[in-house]
């Protein structure tokens, strides 16, 4: 089915070239062959079905699918270890001075909070944060599976050992309410379950009834959670995050940095590509 148009194309160029001999536009048989091949390639290009990059992928808020029915627990910066949470949260997987950089204990007691932040101080980092059970780095290098598992790896990777996950935005849904938060730690319990975080697997059993998401007190309060709960979550690009209490505070907050006029490609590379269209 594709041969006949190509023959016609070659016939066309032959006739055209013969008719223009008086003008000497083609001066040799070599030039003739090159011109014929160009027309042949153009004919094939027009005959082949064209695939536009990205047409098979969802865009905008629907680019990433929801992870539904995930047992969700609450954690906080400065949290002390307990039987069900043996790892203290003075440091995170990516920040050895997390509590210090945050500004102190992110007290979860509702009576000691106001407008989604601790009543005693304004946090220096975004109070809307989460943990998911995968870390793309270990011992100063990048895990080998991260390159194929993380959808935005190619865009944001800078060097081995620097996370492409820290600070990425996710949406967390409970009922008809959706909160937005940044990925700032790894857990609960695991840091290796990329098949769940980026694939179709479900969270693995653990001491908290198979919990697959930790959320901060600010996320808890916005969603109206009462301790352990069940939520849905998904990744979102920064440009698809609507204004809200999650865009107000923090030196690590994409939107605070943007308002300050910072170069996101230098200070928030993991979200910079996701903000490009919003800035345009």
Show which residues each predicted segment covers:
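Secreted/periplasmic proteins
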Residues: 23-280
């Amino acid at each position: 089915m594709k041969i006949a148009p190509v023959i016609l194309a070659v016939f066309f160029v032959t006739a055209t070239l013969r008719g223009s001999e008086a003008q000497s536009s083609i001066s040799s048989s070599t030039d003739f062959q090159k011109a014929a091949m160009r027309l042949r390639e153009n004919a094939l290009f027009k005959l082949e079905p064209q695939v536009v990059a990205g047409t098979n992928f969802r865009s905008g808020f629907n680019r990433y699918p929801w992870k539904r029915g995930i047992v969700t627990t609450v954690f906080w910066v400065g949290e002390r270890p307990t039987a069900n949470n043996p790892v203290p949260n003075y440091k995170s997987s990516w920040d050895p001075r997390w509590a210090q950089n945050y500004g102190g204990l992110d007290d979860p007691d509702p009576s000691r909070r106001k407008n989604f932040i601790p009543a005693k101080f304004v946090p220096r980092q975004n109070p809307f944060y989460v943990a998911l059970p995968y870390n793309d780095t270990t011992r100063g290098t990048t895990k080998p599976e991260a390159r194929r598992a993380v959808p935005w790896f190619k865009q944001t990777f800078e060097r081995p050992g620097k996370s492409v996950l820290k600070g990425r935005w996710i949406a967390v849904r409970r009922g008809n309410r959706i909160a937005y938060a940044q990925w700032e730690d790894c857990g609960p319990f695991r840091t290796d379950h990329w098949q769940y975080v980026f694939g179709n697997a479900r969270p693995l059993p653990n001491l908290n009834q198979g919990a697959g998401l930790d959320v901060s007190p600010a996320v808890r309060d916005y969603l109206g959670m009462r301790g352990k709960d069940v939520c849905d979550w998904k990744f979102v690009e920064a440009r698809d995050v609507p204004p809200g209490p999650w865009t107000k505070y923090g030196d690590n907050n994409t939107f605070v940095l943007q308002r300050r006029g910072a170069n996101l490609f230098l200070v928030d590379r993991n979200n910079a590509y996701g903000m490009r269209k919003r800035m345009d």
